[in-house]
C-alpha cells in the first residue's frame, strides 16, 4: 500500500520480543511520546504563555508566575526560587530542600493562593495541597553549567557551546508529583479538560514551563550582575537548553502496576512501526526527510556524552550503525526498490544492529509520516477498566496462564538468584524501594509486582483444584490470588500488558524499566548513574514559549549543538 492508513500487512513485532527489559532499556522517544504530543497540541490550538510575575531579587530568589491560556482554560505555574545551602543539594529522594519548587495551578491564582502555596510548595511531600493544584515539582541547578552560563551572559557573551552541550540543561527536576498526591487534584477531576485529558499532559506541561523559567532565571541573574553588559541567550542556544530530570526507582513499578495502560502505549507504537514497514512506495520527499533526520540523529548521538562505561560503549556502536544506515539509504539506494522498502531496511537492521540501533531506527522511521503516526497517540489512555470474569473455570484459567504466561512459567524460582530482590513501598519517603531479600528487613511489605512469581504460585494452586470450579469459588477460598487472577485475564486480552522478564532477579536492572517509560515521556540523552537511577533531558531543541506558532513547531527531535559565534551579543 502507498499510504499505510489501514490494517498493516506487515505483522506487529511480538510481545515476546518487544516486552523484554533489554529492549525496553534501549528505547527512544517517538512522535507519539507525551512531550511531542503536547507541543503539537500547543501549536495546533495556539496556546499562549505569559509571564505575569517575576519578583526575584538580585540573587535570583523569589516568586514567578507563568500563565498558559488554551482555547478552553487557563493554567498557571507558580515558581518559588530559594537559597539552598550547598551541603543540602542532592537529587536523591531524601532531600528536604531544593533550588526551586513549583506548583501547577488550575486557573489563575489570587494573592491568597500564592501566599498559601509559598508556604506549602517548598515543603514538597510534607506540604498540604488542594484540588486547585494539579502538579507539584522541584528542581536543582546543574553545578556543571548554571553558574558558567550566568557568568558568560553577565560578560555579554554566549555560553561555551561544548560545556553547554555536555549537560544540555540549566536545572533538573528531581520529582514531578500529580494525580491526587498530598491533597492535589485527582486526575479524574481534569480529564474532561481536553488539554490535559491524555496521559501525563499536566506533568509534561509543568516540565515545559519549568524549562522556560530556567532560561529567564539565568538571564535575570546576568542582568543583575552587570546591567550594562549582560546579554540574553541567543534563540538557538536557548532552544538547545532543555530541562533535566533525575529519576530513580519511584516510577519503575508504574509499568507493572498498569498493564492495560502499558499495552495501549506499546501497542500504539508497534502498530505505527507495522504501518510504516507496510508502505510499498517511499516517495523521494520521504526519502529526503529520512536522510535529513538520519544526519541530525548522528550529530545528536555524537553529543550524547555520559560517564557510564556501558552506555558509552553502546553509543559508539550506535554511531557505527548510523553510518551503515546512511550508506544503505543513500539517494538511489537499491533498498527503495524493494517491494516494501522500510520493511527491508528494518529487517536488515534487525539482523545486523544492536538492539539500541534497532530501536533508534524505529524512532527515525516514524518521523517522515505524521499523517500515519500522530493519531495513534489518541489510543494511549485507558477509558475504562477491564471487568473481571468470575465465571471462568479453573481449567479455563489454567489454559490462559499456559497460553499467555509461558514466559513466567519458564523461570526457575528454585534458583535463589531469581528471587534476589523484593520491592516495597517506603511510608517514610512515599516512594517504592528495592531490598535484598535475604539481607534486608521488610519482605513482609513486598509490593505485588513480582508477576512471574505470583503467576507460578497461582498456576500451582489452580493445578490442585477441581477443573470445573469457577473463579468465584476458587477466590473465595484463596483470596491471596485475586490480584493475579485479574491480571491474567487482562494479559490474555492485551498482548503487550506485561514486562516479560523477572523483575526480582539478580539480573534485573531497574533503569531498563525507567528508560522504557521515560522514552514514552519524550526523554533523551539517558545518563545512567547506576542500575537504580538515571538522568535524562527533556525538551532539548523544543520551541520556546513564544515560538509555539512556528510552522515547524514539531520538528525538534534529535537536537544537536547550534553554531554559536564567539562574539559578544549587542
Each PLM stretch: what is its role?
Residues 2-20, 97-172, 202-388, 405, ...:
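Mixed-charge, Lys/Arg-enriched low-complexity segments
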Residues 24-51:
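Amphipathic alpha-helical segments
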Residues 43-96, 393-425, 430-431, 472-474, ...:
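Amphipathic, interaction-prone secondary-structure segments
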Residues 64, 563-570:
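Secondary-structure-rich domain cores
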Residues 73-83, 108-120, 434, 552:
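Short amphipathic beta-strand/extended segments with alternating polar/hydrophobic composition
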Residues 196, 200, 204, 208-220, ...:
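Acidic, low-complexity, intrinsically disordered interaction modules
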Residues 508, 555-557, 567-568:
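Acidic, serine/proline-rich low-complexity intrinsically disordered regions
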Residues 558-562:
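Secretion-targeting segments and adjacent low-complexity export tracts
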Amino acid at each position: 500500500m502507498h499510504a499505510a492508513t489501514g490494517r498493516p500487512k506487515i505483522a506487529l513485532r511480538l510481545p515476546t520480543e518487544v516486552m523484554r527489559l533489554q529492549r525496553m532499556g534501549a528505547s527512544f522517544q517517538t512522535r507519539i511520546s507525551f512531550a511531542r504530543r503536547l507541543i503539537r497540541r500547543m501549536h495546533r490550538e495556539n496556546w499562549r504563555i505569559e509571564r505575569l510575575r517575576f519578583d526575584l531579587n538580585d540573587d535570583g530568589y523569589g516568586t514567578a508566575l507563568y500563565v498558559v491560556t488554551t482555547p478552553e482554560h487557563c493554567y498557571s505555574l507558580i515558581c518559588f526560587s530559594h537559597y539552598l545551602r550547598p551541603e543540602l543539594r542532592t537529587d536523591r529522594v531524601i532531600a528536604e530542600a531544593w533550588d526551586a519548587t513549583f506548583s501547577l495551578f488550575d486557573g489563575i491564582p489570587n494573592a491568597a493562593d500564592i501566599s498559601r502555596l509559598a508556604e506549602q510548595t517548598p515543603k514538597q511531600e510534607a506540604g498540604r495541597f488542594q484540588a486547585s493544584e494539579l502538579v507539584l515539582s522541584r528542581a536543582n541547578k546543574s553545578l556543571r553549567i548554571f553558574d558558567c552560563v550566568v557568568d558568560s551572559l553577565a560578560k555579554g557573551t554566549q555560553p561555551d557551546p561544548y560545556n553547554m552541550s555536555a549537560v544540555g540543561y540549566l536545572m533538573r527536576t528531581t520529582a514531578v508529583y500529580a494525580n491526587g498526591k498530598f491533597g492535589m487534584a485527582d486526575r479524574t477531576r481534569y480529564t474532561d479538560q481536553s488539554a490535559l485529558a491524555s496521559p501525563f499532559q499536566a506533568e509534561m506541561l509543568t516540565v515545559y514551563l519549568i524549562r522556560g523559567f530556567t532560561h529567564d532565571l539565568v538571564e535575570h541573574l546576568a542582568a543583575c550582575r552587570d546591567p550594562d553588559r549582560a546579554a540574553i541567550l541567543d534563540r538557538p542556544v536557548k532552544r538547545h537548553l532543555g530541562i533535566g530530570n533525575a529519576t530513580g526507582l519511584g516510577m519503575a513499578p508504574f509499568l507493572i502496576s498498569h498493564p492495560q495502560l502499558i499495552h495501549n502505549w506499546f501497542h500504539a507504537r508497534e502498530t505505527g512501526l507495522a504501518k510504516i514497514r507496510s508502505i510499498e512506495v517511499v516517495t523521494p520527499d520521504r526519502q529526503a526527510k529520512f536522510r535529513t533526520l538520519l544526519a541530525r540523529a548522528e550529530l545528536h548521538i555524537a553529543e550524547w556524552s555520559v560517564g557510564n562505561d556501558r552506555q558509552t560503549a553502546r553509543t559508539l556502536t550506535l554511531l557505527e550503525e548510523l553510518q551503515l544506515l546512511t550508506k544503505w539509504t543513500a539517494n538511489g539506494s537499491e533498498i527503495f526498490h524493494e517491494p516494501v522498502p522500510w520493511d527491508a531496511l528494518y529487517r536488515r537492521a534487525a539482523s545486523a544492529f544492536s538492539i539500541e540501533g534497532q530501536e533508534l531506527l524505529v524512532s527515525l522511521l516514524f518521523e517522515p509520516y505524521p499523517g500515519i503516526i500522530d493519531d495513534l497517540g489518541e489510543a494511549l489512555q485507558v477509558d475504562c477498566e477491564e471487568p473481571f470474569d468470575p465465571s471462568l473455570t479453573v481449567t479455563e484459567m489454567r489454559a490462559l496462564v499456559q497460553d499467555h504466561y509461558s514466559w513466567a512459567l519458564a523461570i526457575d524460582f528454585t534458583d535463589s538468584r531469581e528471587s534476589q530482590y523484593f520491592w516495597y513501598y517506603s511510608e517514610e519517603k512515599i516512594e517504592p524501594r528495592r531490598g535484598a531479600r535475604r539481607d534486608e528487613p521488610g519482605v513482609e511489605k513486598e509490593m505485588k509486582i513480582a508477576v512471574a512469581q505470583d503467576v507460578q504460585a497461582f498456576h500451582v494452586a489452580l493445578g490442585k483444584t477441581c477443573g470445573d470450579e469457577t473463579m468465584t469459588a476458587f477466590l473465595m477460598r484463596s483470596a491471596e490470588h485475586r490480584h493475579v487472577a485479574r491480571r491474567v485475564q487482562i494479559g490474555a486480552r492485551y498482548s503487550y500488558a506485561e514486562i516479560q522478564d523477572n523483575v526480582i532477579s539478580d539480573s534485573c536492572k531497574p533503569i531498563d524499566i525507567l528508560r522504557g517509560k521515560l522514552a514514552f515521556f519524550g526523554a533523551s540523552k539517558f545518563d545512567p548513574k547506576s542500575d537504580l537511577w538515571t538522568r535524562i533531558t527533556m525538551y532539548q531543541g523544543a520551541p520556546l514559549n513564544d515560538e509555539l506558532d512556528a510552522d515547524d513547531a514539531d520538528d525538534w527531535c534529535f537536537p544537536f549543538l547550534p553554531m554559536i559565534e564567539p562574539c559578544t551579543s549587542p
